[in-house]
């Protein structure tokens, strides 16, 4: 739309913050995938998301009529990313946060990047924009574009990972473990897709790679033609995040030398490592590490990443996108580090495709171990959540009814408690229901 096009979209089960962002931008959203939409709109092209499948009436009508269509990643590559310096952030976890940090670092240093991020960074209030006018080049246009690089498949007609379309000059490989069990058979299958991404980065580009990850080491062993900078390597070389002080501030080190200090209040080692990766990638784009660290002092996290939704009668309710056991464990640990001995009431909806398959249900108890109480939502699962949470004993409960879950949380909550809601969906508006019931 910023490029001058009229944009109309269709989807189902759209929820905030994306639904409210579309409304604020004046972009019409049609609910569902019925063929009758073609009588209302006659687009020049249909950009097909990977949620669309054969058999959906709208897609069948598009094919029957021979109407032009493409995938989202392909459209981006041809119409937005072509000719630009693309900085891509890939990995199982932390893509949205790290992309937001990187975009903000470039913005704060006058580089006016474009970006496409799978969340809404608070510093920008939108999830995407075209490049702007750099401070150093009045009247010009920034060459930089930051993109969250997802390994999920592109579309029903293109089963490659989305990120192979993006052709980055700078790429962060943040971490890599098994996920997306609905489309990948095992971890080696995902490693192959990351290898394909590495193949697209030019020899004059840069790879910023988590040095702790054996899976990423295997990816690079299959072939790498680009200079590599590591972060978090066990030997202490490359980029490192120092220990955080009581305020959450920490030093950024490169080959043992302190090159900057980040002064913020974000919690958790995972965010320190996200920051170091962003600082390293920004340096490749010309930003000095000390300037990147200074920018992060003004970084506001992404919506749905430990976002405080409200506090009522001494009970604080958080919203977080965590849905993979590793992300759940990291989120709970981060909150524990912040709140000390305060009780954490974890409220979980395992609704990702991987979790719906039950592939990682055995890992849930360990991921929730640091919570004082656990309230799980059974809705939509084909496996027994209560049985999966049984190793947690009496501190865990499972509910098939959302109102019953809310009532149980409210009955348990005491002043000083921290209610941590984790889901990658709308969760039936549970945050608002909790806050209303707590009042």
Model regions and ranges:
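ATP-dependent carboxylate-amine ligase
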Residues: 1-18, 22-30, 42-46, 67, ...
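Short, ordered beta-strand-loop transition motifs
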Residues: 134, 138, 242-248, 311-312
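Acidic-glycine-rich active-site phosphate/pyrophosphate-binding loop
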Residues: 145, 241-260
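Conserved RecA-like helicase motor-core motifs
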Residues: 10, 110-117, 231, 397
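Phosphate-binding loop of NTP-binding sites
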Residues: 23, 37-38, 50-211, 215-226, ...
